[in-house]
């Protein structure tokens, strides 16, 4: 299966790498060019036992790639995982601007059916907001799934 993971923080990098390790073709997308270049070289910016081995193996087997281009990252993807930051706003609520910004952009660029899976830690009702943001521009069918991740760092791969 062809999969895109948008965001290469802890959740995104572990998710993308483990999906590649199970035989999927995964493109991880991040706006941080320096981080993407390091990941392409197999330099892992987080601590997670065995993750570096999985990243190196899957890069060599061409199942795991990294890009700064959302368009490039999602063009062949059947599934698009959103693993984006949701920092607390001034009032303590989750700031959804990264998630909704990417959703809006996805609506402009998807050209065939996609399943968008939100792995970010978000409040109830966010999937509907993501769906609305995509649907403002989308001319094709898509579905949105909420699948928040609560990983225990250092034990996520096991």
Language-model segment annotations:
Residues 76, 82-84, 119:
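Short, well-ordered coil/turn residues at beta-beta hairpins
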Residues 157-158:
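Rossmann-like flavin
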């Amino acid at each position: 299966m062809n999969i895109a993971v948008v965001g290469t923080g802890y959740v995104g990098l572990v998710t993308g790498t483990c999906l590649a390790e199970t035989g999927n073709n995964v493109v991880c997308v991040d706006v941080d060019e320096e981080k993407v270049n390091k990941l392409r070289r197999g330099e892992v910016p987080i601590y997670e036992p065995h993750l570096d081995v999985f990243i190196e193996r899957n890069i060599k087997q061409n199942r795991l790639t990294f890009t700064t281009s959302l368009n490039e990252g999602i063009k062949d993807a059947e599934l698009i995982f959103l693993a984006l930051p949701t920092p607390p706003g001034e009032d303590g609520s989750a700031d959804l601007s990264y998630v909704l910004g990417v959703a809006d952009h996805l609506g402009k660029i998807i050209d065939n059916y996609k399943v968008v899976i939100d792995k970010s830690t978000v409040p109830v009702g966010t999937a509907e907001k993501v769906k609305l943001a995509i649907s403002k521009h989308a001319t094709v069918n898509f579905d949105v799934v909420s699948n928040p991740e609560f990983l225990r760092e250092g034990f996520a791969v096991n």
